[in-house]
Amino acid sequence: MGDLELLLPGEAAVLVRGLRSFPLREIGSGGWNQQHENLEKLNMQAILDATASQGEPIQELLVTHGKIPTLVEELIAVEMWKQKVFPVLCRLEDFKPQNTFPIYMVVHHEASIINLLETVFFHKEVCESAEDAVLDLIDYCHRKLTLLVARSSRGGPPAEEECQSSTPMQLEHHVAPQELQKQAELMEFEIASKALSVLRYITDCVDSLSLSTLNRMLSTHNLPCLLVELLEHNPWSRREEGKLQQFEGGRWQTVAPSEQQKLSKLDGQVWIALYNLLLSHEARARYCLTSFAKGQLLKIPEIWERLERENRGKWQAIAKYQLRHVFSPSEQDLRLQARRWAETYRLDVLEAIAPERPRCAYCSAEASKRCSRCQNEWYCCRECQVKHWEKHGKACVLAAQGDRAK
C-alpha cells in the first residue's frame, strides 16, 4: 500500500494549480470533463495518502494554491445544475440520448468533490484556507442534512441495491433519463453522510472560526437542533428481517449483537459536532447576538445566490445548449472517453482504496472472480456472471473496445 502511487508529486501539483470554476453552461464540456478526471485522480491519491499515513501532499497542495474555495464553488455549481437544469433537460421533447454516460459524469461530480473535501477537511489548516467559502460550505451541509432528515421522516433510508455507488466503468451503456434521475436522488444519501463529516470537521475548528461563521452555524441554521433531529431519526440505521443494519463504507452492513451498543461512525460525527457547538468556550460565548450584529454578519455574498442570480431565467436555454453540444457525443467521443476513464480508474488503485472485499454484481455476495473481458465487474460464481450478462454485456463491450483503442 505504501508504495502505491497514482500521481507523482509534480503531476499532482500541476493538476491542483489547474483547478478552476466553470459557468453552469459549460458543465459537461470537454474542459469540464478533463477537470472531473483530474479531481478523481486527486481524490484517489488523497485517500491513498491518508490510508498509508505518509503525509498528505494533496491537502497541502490545495491549501498552498488556495483551491479550497474553488472546490466549494464547483460543488455548489453542480448541486444547482442538478436542481435547476437536470430536471428541465429530462423534460425536453428531443432529449433522447443514445448514451447517458456523459450525464452520469455530471451527476457523479458532486459526490466526487464532497468525498475529496471529506478527506482533506480533517486538517484544520484546510478549513482556515477556505476563507469566506466556508460559509457557503456550511449552507451546503445544512441543505444536505435537512434533506436527509426529511427523507427519513417520509419513508426511511434507501434499500441496499439503491445505495450502491458505481464507478463510471461499471455504468450501463444506456440508462433511461428517468432512471438517471432516480440514481441522482439515491446518490444524495451518501453525499449527505459525507456532508455530515465535513460539517463535523468544521466544528473542530470552532475556537478559530470567525464570528460570522459561528453565527451562520448557531443562529442562522441552528445546527444543534438539526443535529438532534438526526440523532432522533437515525437515518443510517434500519432493521431488515429482525437484524440491525448500519450504513457504513457506502453500503448497508449487518451489525453483530455484541456490537450493537457501540456508536456508529456517523452517530459519532453527530455527537462530536454537538459537543463542539454546545460546550466549546467560543461557541457558548458567541451564541447570543444582537439583531443589528446578525444583520451585519449576514450581508456576506453567497456562492449559491450569485450563481442563481447569474443564471436566473436561463435554465431551459442551458439545458438545450448542453443537449446539443455536451450530451449528444459521437461514438468516437464515447470510446475516447471510455479509454480515458479506464486509465483514470486503475484497478490496483481502486482495490487499494476499497473499504472491503468486492461484491458480486448479481447477488451481492463476496466475490473473488472478475469479468475476464472488461476486468470491471466481480462475481462469486459462473452462474451469477451468466445471469448478469444481459445487463452487463453492452457496458462490457464498450469497456473492452476502450482498452483495445489504447
What are these regions, as identified by a protein language model?
Residues L398, D403-K406:
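Eukaryote-specific long, low-complexity intrinsically disordered regions
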Residues C360-C363, C371:
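Short cysteine-rich clusters marking metal-coordination/redox-active sites
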Residues G2-R359:
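Extended alpha-helical interaction scaffolds used for oligomerization/partner binding
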Residues R370-V397:
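Cys/His-coordinated zinc-finger cores
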